[in-house]
Amino acid sequence: MQTFILAGGCFWCLDAVYRTLDGVQDVISGYIGGHTAHPSYDAVCTGATGHAEAVKVVFDEEVIPADVILDVFFTLHDPRQLNRQGADVGTQYRSAMFPADAAQEQLFRDAISRAGELWDGTAVTTIEPVGTWYDAEDYHQDFFAKNPGQGYCNAVAVPKVNKVRKSFAQYVRAA
C-alpha cells in the first residue's frame, strides 16, 4: 500500500473521485500545511490557519499505478489556478502535494511535468513538507456519498467524477 497526500480545491471533490477508483483502499479528508494545531473546518475556511483542504489517498499499486493516481489528480483540478479552484478562493484551496519521502517527491515532480500536457499553461502546484496531518471532522468524510443531493456536490463534484470515469474507465470500480 502507498499513501499520497494531495490538495487541489475542495476535499469533497477529491474524495468523491478517488473513491470511484479500483485499488483505492481509503480516502481521508483533512488539513495539512498550516501553522495552527487541530484546526477546525471553520478556521481553515478563513485562510488564517495556513492549512490546505487535502486528502490522503491509500491505494494498492498492484491494482492502480501511482502515476494513474497522480494523473487523476491533475485531471480533476486545474493546477494553473493559484490559491483557488473555480469559485472556491483562498490558500486552503491551493494545488499542493505533500511527499512522504524523496521517492514520492520525484513521482510528484514528474506528475507536475506531465500536467503540462493536460493543461495549456504552467502548473502552480507546490510540493510542500508533509508536516502534521489533521483529519477533517467526521461529517466531511465521504461527504459526496452521504449528501447526494447537496447543491455544491451536484454542481462541482459530479462533473469531476464523470470526467474521471470517462478518462480513466479502466480503473473505475465496478458498480
From Swiss-Prot:
Keywords from UniProt, A to Z, are: Oxidoreductase
List its EC numbers.
1.8.4.11
Q: Which Pfam families match?
A: PMSR
Please verify whether the record's keywords include Oxidoreductase: yes
* Record flagged with keyword Oxidoreductase: yes
Catalyzed reaction equations: L-methionyl-[protein] + [thioredoxin]-disulfide + H2O = L-methionyl-(S)-S-oxide-[protein] + [thioredoxin]-dithiol; [thioredoxin]-disulfide + L-methionine + H2O = L-methionine (S)-S-oxide + [thioredoxin]-dithiol
Active-site residues per Swiss-Prot or TrEMBL entry: C10
An annotated Gene Ontology molecular function? L-methionine:thioredoxin-disulfide S-oxidoreductase activity
Q: Name one GO biological process term.
A: protein modification process
Cited NCBIfam families:
msrA
Its annotated function is as follows: Has an important function as a repair enzyme for proteins that have been inactivated by oxidation. Catalyzes the reversible oxidation-reduction of methionine sulfoxide in proteins to methionine.
What family is it from?
Belongs to the MsrA Met sulfoxide reductase family.
- HAMAP family for the chain: MsrA (MF_01401)
| Database matches in PANTHER family | PEPTIDE METHIONINE SULFOXIDE REDUCTASE, PEPTIDE METHIONINE SULFOXIDE REDUCTASE MSRA 2
Name used for this protein in its record: Peptide methionine sulfoxide reductase MsrA
